[in-house]
Amino acid sequence: MGQTFIVFTPTNDMRALHPAEVVFFRYCAERKQWEVILSTQLPVVLRRGMTAEQIIKYSPCFVQIHQSYIINIDYLMIIKDNKCMLYPPFDNVTELFVSRKYKKELQDRFCL
């Protein structure tokens, strides 16, 4: 299942999250902040300064697929045309493309 971990919001509030609650993380270049999309489909903005390297250390199920995206592989259904398709009700998410830089790591990790 994975250990609960703590993230900080921009207002310095601490938010406890369980890996199963996290569908994916998205980097907002405009704000220069990561946000986490939860299984409730609500986004939680993370404090500035958080890096992808820090995020993927929270759980082995968090995998970076693009400079701006980290997914929870437990929600991954299929990769089609370099696009991650998630299990319902997240099958309408269309933004999760796997970049060339991260594709090899993803394939190696899952023996694809």
Q: Residue spans of the language-model regions?
A:
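Basic, polyanion-interacting recognition surfaces, primarily
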Residues: 2-112
